[in-house]
Swiss-Prot record:
Record-level GO BP terms: lipid A biosynthetic process
GO cellular component assignments: membrane
Keywords: Glycosyltransferase, Lipid A biosynthesis, Lipid biosynthesis, Lipid metabolism, Transferase
UniProt lineage: Bacteria, Pseudomonadati, Aquificota, Aquificia, Aquificales
Keyword Transferase included in the entry's annotation: yes
InterPro entries in alphabetical order: Glyco_trans_19
Molecular function terms, GO-annotated: lipid-A-disaccharide synthase activity; phospholipid binding
Disulfide bonds listed in the record: none
Superkingdom field: Bacteria
Catalytic activity as recorded in UniProt: a lipid X + a UDP-2-N,3-O-bis[(3R)-3-hydroxyacyl]-alpha-D-glucosamine = a lipid A disaccharide + UDP + H(+)
Protein name as it appears in the record: Lipid-A-disaccharide synthase
Entry similarity comment: Belongs to the LpxB family.
Role, per record: Condensation of UDP-2,3-diacylglucosamine and 2,3-diacylglucosamine-1-phosphate to form lipid A disaccharide, a precursor of lipid A, a phosphorylated glycolipid that anchors the lipopolysaccharide to the outer membrane of the cell.
Gene: lpxB
Origin species: Persephonella marina (strain DSM 14350 / EX-H1)
C-alpha cells in the first residue's frame, strides 16, 4: 500500500481533503489534519487548528508552532512517503513541496493558491515543485500555460465544493431541534473558523444583531461553530440580549450548511464560506476585519477588485462587502436591514447567486481528482 502525506492549513480545505481521502482508500494517509480528515482515518502529525492563521500580524503568535510542525512534517517525508498532496496554504505548503521534490516524492497541488488574485510571483515555484496541479477554476490552466511540461501537468476538474455541500434537515426539523419557534426566521452569523477571526468579528456581528433585532423581532440568530471554538463563541455570545443559538457537529452533521440553507439572511466572514453560502442562494453580507498592517500589505499584493469569491466570479459586487472600518455594527445592521426590507434587492441578489452557482461547473470534481492522483501514483 502506498503511503501519502496530505497537508491542509484551513478548515475549508479539511472538507475537500477528507472527501479526497475517502475517494482514495488504497493509500495509507498521514498529515496535517482537520476534524473531518481525522474522522476519515488520516493519521495526524499536527491538527490544522493549531497552525491555521490569516495575516502577517495574526501569524506571529503561532510562528514557532508552525516552524516545529514543518520540521516534523519533513522528518516524516524521509520515512517512506510515496506521494505528497497539499491543499492551498501556500506559505507552508510550497516549502513542503520543495522538500518532497528533493526526495523524489511525487507531488500534487489539490486546490492551488489563488495566484490570479495575488501572489503571481509564486507561479514559477508552484510549477517547479509540483508534478500535478488540480485546477478548480476553468481559467487556471491558462495561467500556467507557459510552465506546462513533462514534469508539470495542470488538469481542470471543476469545483469540489459542489460535491461536499450536503444538508439533512428541513427548515421545520432544523428549527425544532434547536428550539426555534416555527414563525421565527433564522439569521445566520458566520464569523469564520480561525480563533483570530472569531475574536475579532463575532463581537461586531453580535452588536449588529442587537441593532437588527430591535427592528426585527421575528428573527432568531444562529452561529455554527467548530468544536474547538465552541467555548470561545459561547463566552463571547453570553452577554448579548438577542435570541441566539450556537450549534456544532454535536447537533448536526453539517452545521454551517444547515444555517446557510435555512437562513433568511446571513453575515459571513470572507473566505470559502462566502462561496458555500452563495450556492445555497440566500442573500448575505461579506464582512471582514484584520490588523491595519495585514490589510495594507494585502491591498498592495492583491490584483482584483473584490474580496468575495461570488463577486469575483460575477465580475461585479452582487454581495455587499464591508471591510475594515466599514465592518462595524451600525453598517452591518443598516445593510442587513436593507436587504431584508427591500424585496426587489433581495430577489435580484438571489438571481445573481444562482448564476454564480451555475458558473462552478458540474459535480464530480472529487472523483476526477482521485482518478488523476491514482494515475500519477502509478506512473
Amino acid at each position: 500500500m502506498k503511503k501519502a502525506f496530505i497537508s491542509v492549513g484551513e478548515i475549508s480545505g479539511d472538507n475537500y481533503a477528507s472527501q479526497l481521502v475517502k475517494a482514495l482508500p488504497d493509500f495509507m494517509w498521514v498529515g496535517i489534519t482537520g476534524p473531518k480528515m481525522r474522522e476519515a482515518g488520516v493519521e495526524t502529525v499536527e491538527k490544522l487548528e493549531n497552525i491555521s492563521v490569516v495575516g502577517l500580524m495574526e501569524a506571529l503568535p503561532k510562528y514557532f508552532k508552525i516552524k516545529e510542525t514543518f520540521k516534523r512534517s519533513v522528518e516524516i517525508l524521509d520515512k517512506g512517503i510515496d506521494l505528497l498532496v497539499v491543499v492551498d496554504f501556500p506559505g507552508f505548503n510550497l516549502k513542503l513541496l520543495k522538500e518532497a521534490k528533493k526526495r523524489g516524492i511525487k507531488t500534487v497541488y489539490f486546490i492551488a493558491p489563488q495566484v490570479w488574485a495575488w501572489g503571481k510571483g509564486r507561479i514559477p515555484k508552484i510549477a517547479q515543485y509540483t508534478d500535478l496541479l488540480i485546477a478548480i477554476w476553468p481559467f487556471e490552466k491558462e495561467i500556467y500555460t507557459d510552465y506546462i511540461s513533462d514534469s508539470f501537468r495542470v488538469e481542470y476538474v471543476g469545483h469540489p465544493i459542489l460535491d461536499i455541500i450536503k444538508t439533512e434537515e428541513t427548515e421545520e426539523s432544523f428549527k425544532e431541534k434547536i428550539g426555534i419557534e416555527k414563525d421565527k426566521k433564522i439569521f445566520g452569523l458566520l464569523p469564520g473558523s480561525r480563533e483570530s477571526e472569531v475574536k475579532t468579528l463575532l463581537p461586531i456581528l453580535l452588536s449588529s444583531a442587537e441593532i437588527i433585532y430591535r427592528k426585527r423581532e421575528d428573527l432568531h440568530f444562529v452561529i455554527p461553530s467548530t468544536p474547538n471554538m465552541e467555548e470561545n463563541v459561547k463566552q463571547i455570545a453570553g452577554s448579548k440580549k438577542v435570541p441566539l443559538s450556537v450549534i456544532t457537529v454535536k447537533d448536526f452533521r453539517h452545521p454551517s450548511y444547515e444555517v446557510m440553507k435555512h437562513s433568511v439572511f446571513l453575515n459571513v466572514a470572507s473566505g470559502t464560506a462566502t462561496l458555500e453560502t452563495a450556492i445555497f442562494g440566500n442573500p448575505f453580507l461579506l464582512v471582514y476585519k484584520v490588523s491595519p498592517v495585514t490589510f495594507f500589505i494585502g491591498k498592495m499584493l492583491v490584483s482584483i477588485d473584490y474580496l468575495g469569491l461570488p463577486n469575483i466570479i460575477a465580475g461585479r459586487e452582487i454581495i455587499k462587502e464591508l471591510l475594515q472600518k466599514e465592518c462595524n455594527p451600525e453598517s452591518i445592521a443598516r445593510w442587513s436591514l436593507r436587504y431584508l426590507e427591500d424585496p426587489e434587492v433581495y430577489e435580484r441578489t438571489k438571481n445573481d447567486l444562482e448564476k454564480v452557482k451555475k458558473a462552478l461547473g458540474e459535480k464530480g470534481a472529487i472523483k476526477r481528482s482521485a482518478d488523476l492522483i491514482k494515475e500519477l501514483s502509478l506512473s
